[in-house]
Amino acid sequence: MSSSTQPRLVIYHQTLHQPNNGPPVSLLPLITNNTCVTHVIVAAIHVNEGPGNITLNDDPPDAEKHATLWGEMVWVQASGVKVMALLGGAAKGSFERLDGDDIARFESYYAPLRDLLRQHRFDGLDLDIEEPTSLPGTVRLIDRLRADFGPDFLITLAPVATALLPNQPHLSGPAFDYRLLEQMRGHEIAWYNTQFYCGWGDASTTAWYDAIMSVGWRADKVVMGLITNPANGAGHVEGSRMESVIRMLRAKYPNFGGVMGWEYFNALPGGTERPWEWAANMGRALRAPVPTPPAQQQQVPIRPYGMGAVPAQLPPAQHHFPAESVKTLQYLGFSQHQAVAALNSTGGNVEYAAGLLFQD
């Protein structure tokens, strides 16, 4: 990590208002309560049909409802916390419009995005690619961001955990290889906000992180992504257990990349009343003295990307799919990891999931 030897503490901020059109969710407690948060990622920017048709979630960025957000961003940044924007996410279309060989089309969609990032002085952009996308299109976007914003602008990606392992389904399309992207543009990518939840991984032990390290990833570039509240998705890990996992990862990997949380507004244990408590607890675990690891916990030798299969001992990822759907795919000869990942990719459709697995 170029700017600090300390692990990152990243929090996503998508639900910008309390439920039922309530008041804005304030970011200021993250800095007034000494949480040690290092990065806030505002989500989600969508590049919609028609050049210049950009929304922050469902509304124009300059909508009155966002005034508090833009005002608080300045205070958060003044405290030393970097504030980034998330592009894409579950709502598809942003990357499709920025992809393809038509340069004029790319420019027409990219320029308004660039102007928005400049207007609000974001410190970086997180690319959450949850739709089929090409590597050349992503490389072009990364190169253009670097050219327009300079060397200090943070460029991150948000893959699911399976995307960093060989031969596993993920959300960015069968032709998209994050390991190849890292080889091509790793020098421009600050880190990966890796999703260890919603059936794509497991954060209750170090096993999935260890597996990613074993196929050649650098620990300083892999941030372990966590669900902050079970209402936000499957795979939530209770606080004290998560803190124990973090301590083990820091002992195993002195350059551990840190943790991120999805998302801020209802993070436990404080919930909607005190959501900053999650960050404060994670911050203590990330800043506490590092225990000395036993010899058998030292990192295995790094192998070239793609060598070896996913370790068979990986704990199953938590998910919400019917057991019968998973078993159907297992009967066809696929592992539980593959079955859950394919169901995630196809919205739970067993037939489409089987087709995806056989295609791979």
Predicted regions and their residues:
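Short basic/hydrophobic patches in alpha-helices and adjacent helix-turn junctions
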Residues: 214, 244-252, 328-332, 345
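Short, amphipathic alpha-helical interaction segments embedded in low-complexity terminal/linker regions
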Residues: 290-360
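Surface-exposed patches in mature extracellular/periplasmic domains of secreted proteins
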Residues: 129, 258-261, 341-342
